[in-house]
């Protein structure tokens, strides 16, 4: 029913295999609930004029909360994932996770109020977090870039304020889902996302299924060992790859050239490298080499058709992506494309809306099944 365009009762009878009286009763129930719009009768093709109906994508709403170390993106959307309102707020500082999450939940409720959406019509919220997420438990197990956020019952804290279903997921996983839905990985059922910022992480989709792993740590490539010489080295909580190839490592390789504007320093580095700055060139080559090796390793294990590069490292950074591609080409045996993110910072938001819409549809489907059961067995 939620396909674009109209449908008729006759089509519902044919597709569902249910009787005309059952479909009539269920359709009437859905129209009364506002899930479906009654558009009256359509043109006749020779017989009775058909009753036209349309799924009401604004019968209820979904939302997403993409929590970052400094900024949090909020969005409200309809049941097809079409964004209605979007806002960026500061991630609370100097408070514990309970207070911080409650504050962000209040920000989302304020956004709903400004959009004139009643709280009771919010069916599902997806919350993305930068760290290890226990998906089944709805817990943020560890978030190195959020001080003090460890073993946080995110789902329960947010649900207590929002009073709706909350789904919690790792932000890089959401980014991959977003790119697969509306970005650079569209049409690729086996793909991966490599995120490089202050932290490093990856997400993997195989045959359309997002991988979480036994400990919900699939894609935690920050700890990938980049060579035998690093086996006995202590990298603390950051991990080998993150220490060698994260933004802090790149800044350390080009310390004198980092401008004050954080949005400009990657383009400044690449421009310096193009202009012949030897230190900038080495910084790009060494960093791209590490990321390229890690990307090739992912390709060898996962066999994707495409790997998407995202995060602050790759914003406005096609030359850096080219350097990564050069390394991957020398190492890969199973060819795959390496592309830049199309959605950028909005990728986790898009993925979160996809997750929230899926949960909302699950709820609506359950309600529909109950309605059908009541109609079949009054």
Positions of PLM-derived features:
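ATP-binding/phosphotransfer module of carbohydrate and carboxylate kinases, centering on a glycine-rich
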Residues: 1-41, 45-121, 161, 228-232, ...
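Phosphate-binding/catalytic loop of phosphoryl-transfer enzymes
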Residues: 65, 79, 121-240, 357-378
């Amino acid at each position: 029913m939620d396909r674009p365009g109209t449908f008729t009762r006759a089509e519902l009878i044919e597709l569902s295999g249910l009787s005309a009286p059952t479909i009539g009763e269920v359709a009437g129930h859905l129209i009364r609930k506002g899930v479906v719009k009654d558009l009256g009768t359509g043109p006749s093709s020779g017989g009775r004029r058909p009753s036209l109906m349309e799924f009401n994508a604004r019968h209820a709403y979904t939302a997403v909360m993409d929590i970052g170390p400094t900024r949090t993106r909020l969005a409200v959307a309809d049941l097809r994932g079409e964004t209605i309102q979007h806002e960026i707020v500061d991630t609370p500082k100097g408070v514990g996770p309970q207070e911080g999450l409650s504050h962000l939940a209040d920000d989302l409720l304020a956004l709903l109020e400004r959009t004139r959406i009643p709280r009771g019509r919010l069916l599902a919220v997806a919350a993305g977090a930068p760290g290890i997420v226990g998906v089944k438990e709805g817990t943020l197990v560890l978030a190195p870039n959020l001080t003090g956020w460890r073993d946080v019952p995110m789902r329960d804290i947010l649900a207590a304020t929002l009073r709706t279903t909350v789904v919690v997921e790792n932000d890089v996983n959401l980014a991959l889902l977003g790119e697969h839905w509306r970005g650079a990985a569209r049409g690729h059922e086996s793909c991966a996302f490599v995120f490089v910022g202050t932290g490093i992480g990856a997400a993997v989709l195989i045959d359309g299924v997002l991988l979480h792993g036994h400990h919900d740590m699939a894609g935690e490539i920050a700890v990938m060992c980049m060579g035998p010489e690093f086996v006995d080295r202590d990298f603390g909580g950051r991990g080998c790859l993150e220490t060698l190839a994260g933004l802090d490592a790149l800044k350390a390789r080009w310390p004198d050239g980092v401008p004050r504007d954080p949005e400009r320093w990657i383009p400044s580095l690449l421009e310096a490298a193009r202009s012949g700055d030897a230190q900038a060139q080495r910084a790009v080559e060494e960093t791209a080499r590490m990321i390229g090796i890690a990307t090739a390793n992912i390709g060898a294990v996962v066999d994707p058709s495409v790997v998407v590069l995202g995060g602050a490292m790759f914003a406005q950074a096609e030359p850096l992506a080219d350097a990564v591609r050069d390394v991957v080409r020398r190492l890969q045996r199973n060819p795959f494309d390496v592309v830049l993110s199309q959605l950028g910072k909005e990728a986790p938001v898009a993925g979160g809306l996809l997750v929230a819409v899926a949960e909302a549809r699950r709820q609506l489907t359950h309600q529909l099944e109950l309605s059908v059961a009541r109609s079949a067995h009054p």
